[in-house]
UniProtKB/Swiss-Prot annotation:
Keywords: ATP-binding, Glutamine amidotransferase, Ligase, Magnesium, Metal-binding, Nucleotide-binding, Pyrimidine biosynthesis. CDD domains: CTPS_N, GATase1_CTP_Synthase. UTP binds at residues 13, 186-191, 222. This is CTP synthase. Signal peptide: none annotated. GO terms for cellular component: cytosol. ATP binds at residues 14-19, 71. It comes from Brucella ovis (strain ATCC 25840 / 63/290 / NCTC 10512). Pathway: Pyrimidine metabolism; CTP biosynthesis via de novo pathway; CTP from UDP: step 2/2. Belongs to the CTP synthase family. GO terms for biological process: 'de novo' CTP biosynthetic process; pyrimidine nucleobase biosynthetic process. CTP binds at residues 13, 146-148, 186-191, 222. Homotetramer. The active site is at residues 380, 514, 516.
Length: 542
């Protein structure tokens, strides 16, 4: 039977509950356990698919097409286990499910209430489908005290009573701030956070305390006394250089041992930390470094590109180099010459995005990379802009544009109206809803055997995750290929372009999918490993 770990947060948001959950899962895996992680988000959106990147950060897409919280990306990267639709729930989805049941008459005329109907729906989500796992870690989004989080906290409180004794453990992640004027760390915020949690009926078994410096033993004893937890269960979570240092740091502090002890597992299997130690060693002992320009439109919030950032660092791990990122707002190039910004970098990456803002700047970045022979990686929107650049400057179609930006006489990029998903034909209309209407999830692509991208993959058949509503127009394929832009990958039915490349360029590849979503520290995605390898070669020329 599965054991459950519920992870809550207090004092402030953005403390790193997702990283903590992922790191603990990795530590339990290192001891040979089968682990699943689930995220419970209190917001009323059905999913984050239509939320602004500035509000929510990245939307992480799973193989089965779920648009989910970026924390699921951390879960996948740390554990290697692909997430799915059933690993993330929101208040919006819960209420939608309940309303659908009420309309069908499933509640037999009962008054539908938060307790028991909403809490039961949450509990069903937590408990469903866990037969093959030893541990299920549930991260509760938000902060203790938030109104939105109350039904979730009530649900996990009830589960603590309903699950067999010894199969539920509560971890509370808090902040212990340092006050310079006093010259000391303060325990009071954590005390109040635990008091709030206990007033709901949840007594934390373990405190995971974030701090920017070593927590004195006297302060740990104080937290133990006032928060009613064992002294050994007050675990300090100090700031570290990279997120991939977190599992090792938590292991040294005894988090995994304390969790197993709370479950009464003694003796516990010995952990194998060699893979994490190797990753940490490579990160802290690079044999060189490269600089990659990321030309985007959400550069003010790096969380909007979380998986992309990590995939680039994974490419650095594969090549034993440090990857420095030069963030450039694409709109800058619409009023300034790109050359001073891009001449000194070793690679240019144009990531995914939506809308017209910054598009011309991204087109200019693709033009610079093509003409100057700088490695270029265009992902989703970045591939589309590379095709528009080629249409304008190589084919001579001056009005080449995307129908996403408005009516155009030359829609080199256009709205997809239908595509195959397995054996089913998916259809969309331009006037349809935005939420959940994109081409989402893993789709197959077929690569030309003699293409550069097929050599990188070592295969001509690939499966990658997609999230897009627009696609390069197949009607322009012949003219673009005649100008030198090779359509190296297509959907199996030959209708949707998936990858493009220039044969006479050291490394210029555009992909319609999002390879960053499948990259792992232990298994860097081949495209990112190859891109960084090309950047290393470019660094010798600059």
């Amino acid at each position: 039977m599965a054991r459950y770990v519920f992870i809550t947060g207090g004092v402030v948001s953005s403390l790193g509950k997702g990283i903590a959950a992922a790191a603990l899962a990795a530590l339990l895996q290192a001891r040979g356990y089968r682990v699943r992680i689930r995220k419970l988000d209190p917001y009323l959106n059905v999913d984050p698919g239509t939320m602004s990147p500035y509000q929510h950060g990245e939307v992480f897409v799973t193989d089965d097409g779920a648009e989910t919280d970026l924390d699921l990306g951390h879960y996948e990267r740390f554990t290697g286990r692909p997430a799915n639709q059933q690993d993330n729930i929101t208040t919006g989805r819960i209420y939608r499910n309940i309303i659908e049941k009420e309309r069908r008459g499933d509640y037999l005329g009962a008054t539908v209430q938060v307790i028991p109907h909403v809490t039961d729906e949450i509990k069903n989500f937590v408990l469903e489908g866990n037969e093959d796992y030893d541990f299920v870690l549930c991260e509760i989004g938000g902060t203790v005290g938030d109104i939105e989080a109350m039904p979730f906290l009530e649900a996990i409180r009830q589960l603590g009573n309903e699950l067999p004794r010894g199969t539920a453990v509560y971890i509370h992640l808090t902040l212990m701030p340092y006050i310079p004027a006093a010259g000391e760390l303060k325990t009071k915020p954590t005390q109040h956070s635990v008091k709030e949690l206990r007033s709901i009926g949840i007594a934390p078994d373990i405190l995971l305390v974030r701090a920017d410096r070593e927590i004195p033993e006297s302060e740990r004893r104080k937290l133990s006394l006032f928060c009613n937890v064992r002294e050994s269960a007050v675990i300090q979570a100090l700031d570290v250089a990279t997120i991939y240092d977190v599992p090792i740091a938590y292991h040294k502090e005894g988090l995994d041992s304390e969790v197993l002890s709370a479950f009464g597992i003694d003796p516990a299997p010995k952990p194998r930390m060699d893979r994490w130690e190797e990753v940490s060693h490579r990160l802290h002992n690079p044999e060189g470094e490269v600089t990659i320009a990321v030309v985007g439109k959400y550069t003010g919030l790096k969380d909007a590109y979380k998986s992309l950032i990590e995939a680039l660092h994974h490419g650095g791990l594969a090549n034993k180099v440090k990857v420095n990122l030069d963030w450039i707002e694409a709109e800058v190039f619409e009023s300034e010459d790109p050359a001073p910004y891009l001449e000194k970098v070793h690679g240019i990456l144009v990531p995914g995005g939506f809308g017209e803002r910054g598009a011309e700047g991204k087109i200019l970045a693709a033009k610079f990379a093509r003409e100057r022979k700088v490695p270029y990686f265009g992902i989703c929107f970045g591939m589309q802009m590379a095709c528009i650049e080629a249409a304008r400057n190589l084919v001579g179609i001056e009005d080449a544009s995307s129908s996403e930006f408005g009516p155009t006489r030359e829609p080199v990029v256009g709205l997809m109206t239908e595509w195959l998903k397995g054996n089913m034909l998916e259809k969309r209309a331009a006037a349809g809803d935005l939420g959940g209407t994109m081409r989402l999830g893993a789709y197959e692509a077929v690569l030309k055997p003699d293409s550069k991208i097929a050599q990188i993959y070592g295969s001509t058949d690939i499966h990658e995750r997609h999230r897009h509503r627009y696609e390069v127009n197949i009607d322009y394929k012949d003219r673009l290929e005649a100008a030198g832009l090779n359509f190296a990958g297509m959907s199996p039915d030959g209708v949707l372009p998936e990858t493009v490349e220039y044969a006479d360029h050291p490394w210029f590849i555009g992909v319609q999918y999002h390879p960053e979503l499948k990259s792992r520290p232990f298994e860097p995605h081949p495209l990112f490993a190859s891109f960084i390898e090309a950047a290393i070669e470019q660094s010798r020329l600059v």
